Amino acid sequence: MSGVNEIRSTFLDYFRDAGHAVVPSSSLVPKNDPTLMFTNAGMVQFKNVFTGVEKRPYVKATSSQKCVRAGGKHNDLDNVGYTARHHTFFEMLGNFSFGDYFKADAIELAWTLITKEFGLSPEKLLVTVYADDEEAAGLWRKIAGFSDEKIIRIGTSDNFWQMGDTGPCGPCSEIFIDQGPTLAGGPPGSPDEDGDRFLEFWNLVFMQYEQVEPGVRNSLPRPSIDTGMGLERMAAILQGVHSNYDTDLFRALIDAVAHAVSRAPEPSTRASYRVIADHLRSTSFLIADGVLPSNEGRGYVLRRIMRRAMRHLELLGARDPVMYRLVPTLVREMGQAFPELARSEALISETLRLEEGRFRKTLERGLAILDTETRDLAAGQNLSGETAFTLYDTYGFPLDLTQDALKARGIGVDTKAFDAAMLRQKQAARAAWQGSGEAATETVWFGIKERTGATEFLGYDTEAAEAVIGALLRDGAEVETLKAGENGIVVANQTPFYGESGGQVGDTGTISGPGLKARVTGTEKKLGDLFVHHVTVEEGTLAVGAAVELKVDHARRAAIRANHSATHLLHEALRQVLGDHVAQKGSLVAPERLRFDISHPKPIDEAELSRVEEIANAVLLQNAPVVTKLMAVDEAIESGARALFGEKYGDEVRVVSMGRPVDDEGREVEGRLPNFSIELCGGTHVSQLGEIGQITVLGESAVGAGVRRIEAMTGTAARRHRATESRTLSQLAGLLKAPVADVPERLSTLIEERRRLEKELADARKKIAMGGASGGGDEAREINGVKLMARVVEGVEMRDLKGLADEGKTRLGSGIVALVGVSADGKAGLVVGVTEDLTGRYDAVELVRAGAGHLGGKGGGGRRDMAQAGGPDGAGADAALAAIAEALAAG
């Protein structure tokens, strides 16, 4: 029973038998808490339950929660691999009571589990309690038989938990195990409590107060329980090891790393193996929960974790991408407990493979840049922190790698300046991700739902229905009536209007009654099943309790249905063409068009898009019925139905099946599953696939790293789009005097010819600007013993000025070139180049600044051998060159 998977099952089964609902782990991306970057505790998904604004169908629960601590206040990243218990990813086992049982039962349940089920010796156990919590101390004496020496009173915040400045709070009791005198350290509360001998493994939080304001606490009428046990710590205890990395799960991962790099762990490399094993877990679970590597927010943290692991693979001698080859081992070890890991295996592997390939290029590029930036630094000097951070932030070159690369030369890094730049980046990252999850739902909806109940949705079967108004809102506050000319929100007992969700926009239409007409401009869902209609009252008055008729805009709903069904066909066609790693990451299903985002690491070419469109239309032409069926969620997944990222599913789900399997040519074939597409979906769909009419893919684009966006049209809109394209193509053929089939080739030839002529023209202008191909005897004058070539050039692009300056320096051999380029709109660009032998005497930056003011510019920048500036006043070109000549004469 000491394996990680067995321990998890024992914990959950124990509390299930004690009447707790077993609640699946929530996503690592918090859905209702914009203050958190990642889910970092078991209670996060129950926060609204603890505060009383949300009710669940159970009053006590248990879970094994996925947690990540690698950003924000809870950041263990830099310690991972170098200590026995720090992780970026870990599982928190917990049991929770929402006003059901309290201290006595919580302590009794915990004691029975650890001593009877887990078999821990009571003699090795001890606890801490909050200094003022006499009740908890008495319960430990009674239930566990502990003496006062084994009940340690702690008066600090370590044993008093608060959700925030206000809200539920209460004392804690932590359970410790004495691992024996062979390990250093003293009991909790002693000066050497940070040693390894006494290990805390379970924290029981007794939420019995509400913090009203600083210094003011009230007792809660129904106190609650929140506990958290680290699964990895408990596994180490039960397996008799003193490091989490020596448990069965981590041993399997570390063995996989050793096999992949063909190198056995040694004491000097142990930290690298641990880093890779830990980061593989956090990386894989974050990708499975929809986070992809990027340069901001959660994706920024993910990329940092990934690249830290990849850096350690590099230290172990890996020269090709390796990390993706470790994913199957992780899925084998944890995929049964977390099915999302197995479902996302292809995406995780491909994302890791591509990211590691990019990182290896980053290493090469970063080392080259580092060499350039430190050419003038001697041993004992420091590289600037800003430069080190630019290497890290722009090029993904880690600080530790920069330090390692410079260590052999005796060069350090200004880490204070680096930390300051990092702080600015973290603040920018926090601004990017804060609120990117679902905003915390307004409490007003909880009150309405408690009073009116959930809205019954009738829209699968009808587009019109009678209903009774249960609530009205205007400007966010409940009202009794809405009058003509007023805008507001209507909540009814039932509705045919679809509420925006799953990417499908909400319905529009009308609400009517005797002397009443209101226009519904949109429909949303709150709290999962409370439908809210945004309305403008055009005639009469809407009143709470009134009976009304709700009618959906039929034409708009029909277009939305067609587009939603088309997304299912396109999604499956994309998987068939691109691979099983493709997963939908978001969508917009509107009446005019559809778009959806998929996980795919590179652009989708025209040939692939064409095949996708052909496959989807081939299935459409089957005109097969679209079948919907209600099933248990586990049964649906086992049957092959695809669950979409970001969607929440209840115990019972709606499964939508479409079409018969086809091959890449659109021919019907026998498939592994009976249908072409099977997805969990709560949206509205066509009855027969033929109702879609036609699917036209408009194109694809990048949304972020590893995410592509597909846009398409259906039905009449698709036909009109194709007709417009056809007319445009015919017009092009007429202008080119070529058959339609030859238009691409003719256009390509013309474009290449234009490029050739433009290059010839640009080269000719450069030669004219610099005095012809042969140069000239009078092209430079001598000032203060130095040759100066100073010239105003016209008809030359600003980007070409540097090239001309380099050409001038070559002609001179030794000297200075000053060029002013004046554009057609009168703006000017100034470039000064100094040959290498003169850079000790003259600085191109100073010379540029001498002339820039005459062009209306400020300053200038560059290096000693080449600098540039610009300004709005090209009329000052001659004066600028004269000023440079004067500066040269002044020495």
UniProtKB/Swiss-Prot annotation:
One of its GO terms (cellular component) is cytosol. The lineage of its organism: Bacteria, Pseudomonadati, Pseudomonadota, Alphaproteobacteria, Hyphomicrobiales. This is Alanine--tRNA ligase. Catalyzes the attachment of alanine to tRNA(Ala) in a two-step reaction: alanine is first activated by ATP to form Ala-AMP and then transferred to the acceptor end of tRNA(Ala). Also edits incorrectly charged Ser-tRNA(Ala) and Gly-tRNA(Ala) via its editing domain. It catalyses: tRNA(Ala) + L-alanine + ATP = L-alanyl-tRNA(Ala) + AMP + diphosphate. The gene is alaS. It comes from the Bacteria. Its EC number is 6.1.1.7. It is an enzyme of class 6 (ligase). It comes from Methylorubrum extorquens (strain PA1) (Methylobacterium extorquens). GO terms for molecular function: alanine-tRNA ligase activity; aminoacyl-tRNA deacylase activity; ATP binding; tRNA binding; zinc ion binding.
